[in-house]
């Protein structure tokens, strides 16, 4: 009687019965890493957003840490996007191209 629509309603086992949650899957990019400068919603402070990097979360965090050290500034990883504080697009482009990534400067 195992049906994909049936689930356990009552059990004498202790504890809460939770279904395991699937890890969110990010869509694959087109192979181009884009660097965009953004100031909106940041009280006039500019940040560079790096999108399109096809790495898992642990490797993305390592890459962000390395870029922050080389740029000498702060940053964060949010929802698969690396944020680097300040307008360092040219330096970021050269660093990512040295790693063998195809990079485009997007936006204004």
UniProtKB/Swiss-Prot annotation:
The keyword Nucleotidyltransferase does not apply. One of its GO terms (molecular function) is ribosomal small subunit binding. Residues 1-14 have a biased composition (Polar residues). GO terms for biological process: formation of translation preinitiation complex; regulation of translation; translation reinitiation. Keywords: Protein biosynthesis, Translation regulation. It comes from the Bacteria. The keyword tRNA processing does not apply. It holds the Pfam family SUI1. CDD domains: YciH_like (cd11567). Residues 1-31 are annotated as: Disordered. InterPro entries: DENR/SUI1_TIF, SUI1, SUI1_arc_bac, SUI1_dom_sf. NCBIfam families: PRK09019.1, SUI1_rel. PANTHER family: DENSITY-REGULATED PROTEIN, DENSITY-REGULATED PROTEIN HOMOLOG. Belongs to the SUI1 family. This is Uncharacterized protein YciH.
């Amino acid at each position: 009687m195992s049906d994909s629509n049936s689930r356990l309603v009552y059990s004498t086992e202790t504890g809460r019965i939770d279904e395991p949650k699937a890890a969110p899957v990010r869509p694959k990019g087109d192979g181009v890493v884009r660097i965009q400068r953004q100031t909106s919603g940041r009280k006039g402070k500019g940040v560079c957003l790096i999108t399109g990097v096809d790495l898992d979360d642990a490797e993305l965090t390592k890459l962000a840490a390395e870029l922050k050290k080389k740029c000498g500034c702060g940053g964060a990883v949010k929802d698969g996007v690396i944020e680097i504080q300040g307008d360092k697009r040219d330096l970021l482009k050269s660093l990512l191209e040295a790693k063998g990534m195809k990079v485009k400067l997007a936006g204004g």
